[in-house]
Structures are given as structure tokens and as C-alpha cells.
Regions:
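Histidine-dependent nucleotide/RNA phosphoesterase domain, centered on the 2H-phosphoesterase fold
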Residues: 1-177
Length: 177
């Protein structure tokens, strides 16, 4: 199974993202994410068997125990890659705690022996892939600065359900002791 550690989003945040994505979809063609798939990835892991999932759970619990619940807030739209083949995303307001949480998860997974991709953590929620954008028009799509409390981290499985990509929660680890 393909797995990643992330933060699930509440309904208000999903609503705000869906509203922005719906407006973007009218302007920019692409493969848009399903509303229920919106999340913030802390660390992509990749293929994992049952034994690996046990190690991941231990790493998640250790990382989560170090942090009290905290808030995240939506920022504006932006993109990765080239405008003709972009990943459209909504950023999050910079949060040192969020960055530290992602780093803690990563360090514990590396210590447990996982091979992880290199790269700097960039907090975001993917709205579309293979989007054809006009970068100047992105600013015309407002994003309500919705926020939410982060109280847990989640291990998600990326799988197909009725031929649709879904991110299914496998386990949750509450923040704090």
C-alpha cells in the first residue's frame, strides 16, 4: 500500500478550498482533487507493508507527543512547476510549529530506517494537477483565510475506491501527551 503522514482538514476549511477550486476550475483546465481528499502532507512515505505500518505508527506517536494542538490558516493560491503543467495548491500561513512537526515526523521515520525523498517541507493543500494556469490570474481567485485546530496527525493510504483516487485514514495519533 502507498502511504503518507498528513493532517486531515475540517469541513469549514474544505468548504473554503472547494470554493476556490471551483472558481479556478472555470479558468484553468486540469485534474482537480476531490473535496474529500484535501489534506496537508507532512511526509510522503511510499510503499509500506504491515510491518512498516507498525514502525510508522511508533514514529508518528513519538513525534505527535512532542506537540500541543495548534492552528493552521489558509493563505492564497500558488503553483509548483511550469504554468502549462502545474500543481495548483493553496498555501498555509507560515507556521514554525507545523514545520517542526513535519521535521519531527521525518526524523523519526529516517531513524526507523525509511528511505525518504529529499526536499524541503512546503505546507500546502493540492487542489489540481496538470493544470494549465495563467499565473497573473491566480490572484483573482480569493481564498477565505479559514483556519482550524490541528489536534492529530493521520496515516493515510492512497488507493482506488470505485476507480476514484481516495486518501483513506489508517490511523490517527493525537498531539500532546
Amino acid at each position: 500500500m502507498r502511504v503518507f503522514v498528513g493532517i486531515g482538514l475540517d469541513e469549514k476549511m474544505r468548504d473554503s478550498l472547494w470554493e476556490a477550486a471551483s472558481k479556478a476550475q472555470k479558468l484553468f483546465p486540469g485534474r482537480y482533487s476531490a473535496r474529500e481528499n484535501y489534506h496537508c502532507t507532512l511526509q510522503f512515505i511510499g510503499q509500506a507493508d504491515a510491518a512498516a505500518v507498525q514502525l510508522i505508527e511508533k514514529a508518528m506517536k513519538e513525534a505527535a507527543a512532542q506537540f500541543d494542538p495548534f492552528s493552521i490558516t489558509l493563505a492564497g493560491l500558488s503553483f509548483f512547476r511550469r504554468p502549462q503543467d502545474a500543481v495548483l495548491f493553496c498555501g498555509l500561513v507560515k507556521s514554525l510549529i507545523l514545520e517542526q512537526l513535519a521535521q519531527s515526523v521525518r526524523e523519526r521515520l529516517l531513524t526507523a530506517g525509511f528511505k525518504l525523498e529529499d526536499g524541503e517541507f512546503h505546507s500546502h493543500i493540492t487542489l489540481a494537477r496538470q493544470a494549465r494556469l495563467d499565473p497573473k490570474s491566480l490572484s483573482l481567485i480569493p481564498v477565505a483565510p479559514e483556519g482550524q485546530q490541528v489536534k492529530e496527525i493521520t496515516l493515510f493510504e492512497s488507493c482506488r475506491v470505485e476507480e476514484q483516487l481516495r486518501y483513506v485514514p489508517l490511523m490517527r495519533c493525537p498531539l500532546g501527551k
